[in-house]
């Protein structure tokens, strides 16, 4: 939790939804799975970030991995695009997230997922196309650039927060 007050945590979670993420899937993926199974192969899905990334010494070493130090940061810039368009829907459709069984999700959470995504898409994609007096490709480019900067920034922050020895 960010705040001692559950009221403020709830407000923040709705803001989280408005930037394209889903607080319910985040809670499962991060709080329940990642913090329970930190860096445990087969459970911590953060170790499965991309096929060209070797995040664990237990993964087979492939030739592409010699380039991961070059490919990682540019690829992490794309992470929020994957998150807002694919990841939350995929996680809600799975019967397991990491080591946690999630056979069904409350209807309320499905509604919140779709409403949150609809608000995000409307605010950050649809409305700029309608109201910004610029070519459509400028609006699209601005959206993609903002998502790339957000993904890159989040990657750097989370990488620095998670670099630990022998875990």
Spans of model-derived segments:
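Transmembrane helix-loop junctions in multipass membrane proteins, especially transporters and channels
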Residues: 84, 88, 129-133, 162-167
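Membrane-embedded catalytic scaffold of the fatty acid hydroxylase/desaturase
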Residues: 1-105
């Amino acid at each position: 939790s960010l705040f001692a007050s559950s009221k403020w945590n709830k407000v923040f979670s709705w803001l989280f939804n408005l930037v394209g993420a889903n607080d319910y899937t985040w809670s499962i993926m991060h709080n329940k799975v990642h913090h329970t199974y930190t860096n445990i192969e087969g459970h911590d899905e953060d170790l499965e970030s991309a096929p060209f990334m070797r995040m664990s010494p237990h993964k087979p070493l492939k030739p592409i991995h010699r380039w991961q130090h070059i490919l990682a940061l540019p690829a992490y810039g794309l992470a929020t695009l994957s998150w807002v368009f694919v990841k939350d829907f995929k996680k809600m459709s799975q019967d397991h997230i990491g080591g946690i069984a999630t056979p069904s999700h409350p209807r309320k959470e499905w509604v919140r997922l779709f409403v949150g995504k609809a608000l995000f898409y409307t605010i950050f994609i649809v409305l700029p196309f309608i109201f910004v007096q610029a070519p459509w490709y400028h609006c699209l480019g601005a959206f993609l650039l903002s998502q790339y900067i957000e993904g890159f920034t989040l990657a750097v922050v989370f990488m620095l927060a998670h670099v630990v020895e022998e875990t």
